[in-house]
């Protein structure tokens, strides 16, 4: 059965009033390929849809990749590992499998296989707690967090490992203390594990909700997040990406992608970030911080402690990647999910390659001959060139530009994290990596877009040796000029790669559904 009519049918169905609520349940807002897999995950929900819309064959077998019965043919995406296998893989199959387990839905499958009960309920209203290895992801029911001690803290809390003390995290369940204490190896840093918090877990003699101890009962499912730097896009998207991955680890109920959830940030600083709109992809509620609950004993009916931004061998940050592979389906799914939920418009390419140049307004890593570099590109009829300073634009406006860019050019810096939201055929051109060669190269591999950077060291001209604030020369703390001819050569090469990409539209009139998935 052709996929496009099915997707269009689902589109119309999802917009129809009688399909918005299936037995009182609303279908989540997801891109079409995501929605198909969501429905296959919950067959009872799928059975409520007309059979001509749920499809057969490739549609009925479509899966994400972490499911036990998911076949390689049904996966959301298979990694690309061209050429001979290299490194420590013994075969091509082992190379693909290694990448899939390191950075794709295989990683989700591993987390699911590790979920182990730490505190087991006896009766229906009891508490529960289960976690993956090293307490990197946990979820619980009917748990009491005692935040009364925060009122006496003089300092603001961020990256603290002593937010909770002994007996300030309670549940009524059978606690396996030996098992829980055996998972405390990764507590050297606040952002590596939930161990600093869970080491204080203790047992109440009575059910939490009947104990009379709850000052506040939170009925809304809650994600408690320990987050990285909020003003740095690269680091804050470590948070958002791991939150998205955690939705799959927690996907035991059709409400897994529901936005009626509460986000609680594990610090007392007011939450502020230029990227704060991204939380709207996950929750329709205002973000809480510890300041919203301090002084209270808060009982959560359903609480998730999601994957953390700086886990050892984690996702996004500190991700080990086998050589020779790219195109993580999990990273592509994250990109499509955010663009869909934030309703970022898509415009198919026309006759020209769309080039976006990120102009820095910071003290360091400015391009001193910016005008000279861009002049020949602007004079070329093949290119549509725009120069932008993203720090001056709302984040959703930034995404609207990035999503409709074919070549994104910029100096080494957090703004290059926008490569996550480029079209599949696009190229990220890190003008100069400032002697940090792997950060955005690896991120481009994970997302599955082409990557280029400056190679001719004799054709880049630093203003000086660079002066690190703590002393010594440093390539990130100076400004640069570049050879114009070599710059144009690199851009032309990137354009040729884009034009030859199998997903790049060959004609302006070509249906964008062939390259960018239809969305609901």
Swiss-Prot record:
Q: Which UniProt keywords apply?
A: Endoplasmic reticulum, Glycoprotein, Glycosyltransferase, Signal, Transferase
Where does this one sit in the cell?
Endoplasmic reticulum lumen
Kindly state a single biological-process term from the GO annotations of this entry. larval chitin-based cuticle development
Motif Required for optimal activity: positions: 292-294
Q: Does the keyword Endoplasmic reticulum apply?
A: yes
Domain of life here? Answer: Eukaryota
EC identifiers of the protein:
2.4.1.255
Q: For the motif Prevents secretion from ER, what are the positions?
A: 517-520
Q: What is this protein called?
A: EGF domain-specific O-linked N-acetylglucosamine transferase
Organism equals Drosophila melanogaster
